């Protein structure tokens, strides 16, 4: 398709694949349309920058070069862990303003909102603020000290309780303001920032206060109708001795988190024990965006560094296509499969190195917030080369994959763990050869679940239980149609967390658990013992016509209230997990394949 035809499809709203490509982008509004138009141009520029054999593989569905609407036309990077602590402690310049260390929690979260918008506008992937309970604790203490000072100045009786009460209100208000800021602003990418905040390991009174404020705000919801916010994504660490069991000091906060999850789906949880075992870190590692994980890395002085690090991009390998291409007549040929697998791994390496090469010679001045003002943990000079920051394992670059479920069907046996182990062996060789940290990433595949399946259908027709569904299964996940218990699903997916260490998440589908928090806790605890990163999908919908909070029924034409039959999308709030993030399909539609996949999800019970 020519660039003119693609732009016409955007302007006249006839290109549904483009308009519904990203569930977080409202393609009806000017900023998003402008970003989509720029993306069309960037894709055409990429055709002249990326070697033709890579572009051909991308366009035919053998591989997928992610975010080609941003990179390599411009030297964007993917997702990151923002060094919020360093930025707040050392100050930084934002636009025309010199930001100093905040003196209160309200100012600290206001600055965090501005950092969120700036970072999201200078990269194409997700933004994470890790361990905000610990990082923002000093600003709660400053707020408390100010209230003590006021109480003494005005001779307020019971100064300690006064200061405690005022501080608690200030912390709550600070995170309420942050949540509203995030959900009302647009980045230059034409979307709400993909932002994640993690918490849960702090046990002092200020850290506990922050955790409670985050959860209570999420439980309350947004606006008059108390709708479920999409962002920030909430991720809570669970750990024995901190919050996992009844005798732990933060067990009460875990109970609040369970209530929150039952009403808002978030927080997702990370098992601190398994996370440290997987990443090699001495402290739990937060996901960059929805699921990308860094491994341990030490600076020149031997200190472990997490905040300020990032990912350089993803290329995803179409595993079902390798199997489909390995059939000779009606028989699967193992030797041909091995040959094609190795060829396509080499292809992925070239595609990833092409992405890295696009960053060579680029100066820090292209993204001051990232490279000069501390978001990436450094203060480079404007003319410094950014590529040096990414070498020797400081940044990751990821190889993704999709369709283990379909691959197993085509091969005729459970080959998933075997194939991922072989992929890891290749990645290790690439890392040793180049000095860049290649990681194995379980691709979310919000749009790719449909794109790959559609292209494979065009080539091979309708293949039973593979292409006939209209979507490919997300990474290593069990088929969404398989009727098993949540514990069985966790057990079957858990081994993949320890293989695909560069990115993974598992989730289960449960019925309404608001009145069964003990049951929800049992699922959480089982997940915490067996895998790393986990979420639960539960009904959190709301019909504004009848007031029902039952799950809206998905159909090919939209959602229907199961109580009153309402179909007007403006009269209901529907929330679904698209892949790692939540989305509102009535506000920002899913692609055809993802919509079909959601319709076929069964409850695990």
From Swiss-Prot:
It holds the Pfam family NRDD. The gene is nrdD. The modification Glycine radical is found at residue 580. It comes from Enterobacteria phage T4 (Bacteriophage T4). This is Anaerobic ribonucleoside-triphosphate reductase. Residues 482-605 form the Glycine radical domain. Zn(2+) binds at residues 543, 546, 561, 564. Disulfide bonds: none annotated. InterPro entries: Form_AcTrfase_GR_CS, Gly_radical, NrdD. Catalyzes the conversion of ribonucleotides into deoxyribonucleotides, which are required for DNA synthesis and repair.
